[in-house]
Amino acid sequence: GDSTGIFPANNGTADDLEILIRYILEKHPGIFKITAQEKAEIFENSKAIKKELLNINGYASSRPNFLGGKTGFTDEANGNLVSIFEYKGHKILLIVFGTSNRFEQTDILFNWVKEAYIF
């Protein structure tokens, strides 16, 4: 298998990602807690070497209601973004594929959800 997801035969739909994300949220919620952090420290070689990892997802540092997500980019697929937000006690999952402005598109979708649905 190709764990990087870069191999061209590896592709999925928004429905596939929704199923995967629901599973992770139910069975392994700590994964998204990690992806919501602005930065984290890891240790290599039995704690002899400390490294700081910075999250490239801007929501981790700018949106307190951001629960986690995953960014992605390839030349073939362009920008992709999976984001989970908390809004009025509900988890909002937004998935954006194939865009050069994935964060702007996610913001547009999030604002639409807030206007279109009664919570």
Report the location of each language-model feature.
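Penicillin-recognizing serine hydrolase domain
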Residues: G1-F119
